[in-house]
Amino acid sequence: MAPGAPSSSPSPILAALLFSSLVLSPAQAIVVYTDKEVYGAVGSRVTLHCSFWSSEWVSDDISFTWRYQPEGGRDAISIFHYAKGQPYIDEVGTFKERIQWVGDPQWKDGSIVIHNLDYSDNGTFTCDVKNPPDIVGKTSQVTLYVFEKVPTRYGVVLGAVIGGVLGVVLLVLLLFYVVRYCWLRRQAALQRRLSAMEKGKLHKPGKDTSKRGRQTPVLYAMLDHSRSTKAASEKKAKGLGESRKDKK
């Protein structure tokens, strides 16, 4: 290399920065959420909810996979797969005619429904989500318990949830009617005030008329008095004139 020529090798500092950006800034892991436990009665259906959080936008290549491990079993089998916008039900196992896709990737929902539950469905279901390029993360598991009847504990929880929702609805309705009652009451008071003002305007001309009615006799009396005074003056003047003529 000739003296004074610029070096073509990268700066050691720049190389270190590039290395640290690649090593120390990995993509955030995807996070999958499911219920811990779900309960169902024999012959009924149950929804296995699955949602996720990802640092990336929902990809067209997003995929959901459900696996099932029977109660007491050691191996898990794939029972459902969603990819390229299409759901696929695996032919292996007893769920092939009982699974229904109810999820929506745009809402980050990968839920499925299992129909016609049976005791043999007891076990653990695993939801796995891949949202390229965000594909690193842990799966989430939900345990299904099938009974002849839904357990009381589950019924109590469900009843509490329904009761809470109904309570909120009733509270909103009560608040609506209270606000409406106050508004109607205020409108009625305003209407009464406007009516009173209108009546006051109508009564004012009547008061003026009554005043004029009281003033009219007084005016007539004053007019009669002036006329009588004038007549008396004229009569007196006429009498004086006649008396002067008599003296002459």
Curated annotation (Swiss-Prot):
Belongs to the myelin P0 protein family. N-glycosylated; contains sulfate-substituted glycan. Residues 30-143 form the Ig-like V-type domain. The keyword Signal applies. GO terms for biological process: cell aggregation; cell-cell adhesion via plasma-membrane adhesion molecules; myelination. It is a single-pass type I membrane protein. It comes from Equus caballus. It holds the Pfam family Myelin-PO_C. This is Myelin protein P0. It is found in: Cell membrane. Its main location: membrane. Residues 224-248 have a biased composition (Basic and acidic residues). The gene is MPZ. Is an adhesion molecule necessary for normal myelination in the peripheral nervous system. It mediates adhesion between adjacent myelin wraps and ultimately drives myelin compaction.
